[in-house]
């Protein structure tokens, strides 16, 4: 056991050294100048105008620093060695035109403090992730970010405030004084449109609304079998896809792959032209789904994000509430009634 602990500790130490050696993707690996910043040398003032709302806000304020500008810094913070730099603070009762300040004591990722940042040219941006106050049925009052149709992605959540990226220079360890205005707001996410085969539904859950003390919703993307509309008296089994938050019923494409599409490399799967493969597989699935020998069933992908995460894992829990019951006794019966499911336990399959 002691040997195992030593091995783990050594591996962890090596990993931390490697991560910090990279200085995140927004720095230049050749720049080793990390002059120490004095305790009073960081002064970053961030505020939002009254035009963004006149009520005090609760949430998380995130300050981002990136070397790259091919996309905004808010889309470059990630959980690997290619991340940009971020600093964050929890915020309560923040009023418009009242600046909040990041100073040298702010906690950062992946580099702990402003003191250790390298010199060079960077792009900075601030984002405010809004929280709501939930008065729950179990007596707890919590402040959390409500999902707004994005699948719990703080950098895409509608209604969040953010600033225009700004170029700065850190010279000889001196971080410039900054004043940033959160003058932009993330727009609503367009809802997917119904097609012949794919439908989209959303219901209010009484069970979840009672638990969370506000209106709570469940949704689903519904894939209908071939012949569904021409056989109005037929009832179908239900195949339930349980996974993370789906924005649509992906992997199903009625048209052939786009012949003008240029191959793209997938960093996740280490495959060149993965985007072409995705389109081809989606079209192949459509042909199989509508083929003469494929079983006629209804398939669904459910949307059940919580204030904590992009999905509830479809179970009841003390922390998240009765999601298992809400899906089983509210969402599934509603779908089966709307789209002529058989509605029996033996006719349902989770995959």
Regions found by a protein language model. Give the residues of each.
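C-terminal motif of bacterial Sec signal peptides marking the signal peptidase cleavage site
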Residues: 22-25
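Non-catalytic cap/lid and distal C-terminal segments of serine-dependent acyl enzymes
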Residues: 51, 67-107, 112-351
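Contiguous beta-strand segments within globular domains
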Residues: 37-48, 54-61, 215-221, 240
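Bacterial lipoprotein signal-peptidase II cleavage site
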Residues: 27-33
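Hydrophobic helical h-region of N-terminal Sec-dependent signal peptides
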Residues: 13-20
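Bacterial N-terminal signal peptides that target proteins for export
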Residues: 2-13
């Amino acid at each position: 056991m002691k040997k195992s602990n030593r091995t783990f500790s050594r591996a962890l130490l090596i990993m931390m050294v490697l991560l910090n050696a990279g200085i995140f993707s927004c720095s230049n690996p050749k720049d080793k100048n990390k002059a120490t910043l004095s305790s009073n040398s960081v002064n970053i003032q961030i505020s939002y105008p009254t035009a963004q709302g006149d009520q005090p806000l609760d949430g998380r304020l995130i300050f981002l620093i990136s070397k790259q500008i091919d996309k905004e810094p808010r889309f470059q913070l990630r959980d690997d060695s290619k991340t940009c730099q971020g600093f964050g603070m929890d915020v309560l009762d923040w009023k418009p035109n009242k600046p909040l300040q990041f100073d040298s004591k702010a906690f950062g990722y992946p580099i702990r403090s402003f003191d250790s940042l390298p010199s060079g040219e960077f792009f900075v941006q601030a984002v405010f992730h809004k929280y709501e106050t939930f008065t729950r049925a179990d007596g707890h009052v919590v402040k959390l970010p409500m999902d707004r149709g994005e699948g719990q992605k703080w950098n895409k959540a509608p209604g969040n405030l953010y600033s225009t990226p700004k170029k700065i220079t850190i010279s000889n360890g001196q971080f410039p004084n900054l004043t940033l205005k959160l003058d932009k707001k993330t727009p609503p996410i367009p809802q997917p449109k119904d097609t012949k085969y794919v439908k989209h539904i959303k219901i209010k859950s009484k069970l979840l609304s009672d638990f969370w003390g506000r209106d709570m919703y469940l949704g689903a993307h519904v894939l209908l079998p071939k012949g569904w509309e021409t056989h109005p008296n037929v009832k179908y089994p239900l195949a339930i896809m349980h996974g993370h938050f789906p924005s649509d019923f992906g992997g199903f494409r009625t048209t052939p792959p786009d012949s003008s599409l240029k191959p793209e490399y997938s960093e996740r799967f280490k495959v060149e032209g993965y985007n072409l493969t995705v389109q081809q597989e989606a079209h192949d699935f459509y042909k199989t789904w509508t083929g003469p020998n494929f079983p006629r069933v209804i398939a669904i992908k459910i949307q059940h994000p919580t204030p904590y995460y992009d999905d509830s894992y479809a179970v009841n829990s003390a922390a998240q509430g009765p999601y298992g019951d809400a899906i089983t006794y509210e969402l599934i019966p509603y779908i089966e009634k709307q789209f002529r499911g058989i509605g029996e336990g033996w006719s349902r399959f989770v995959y």
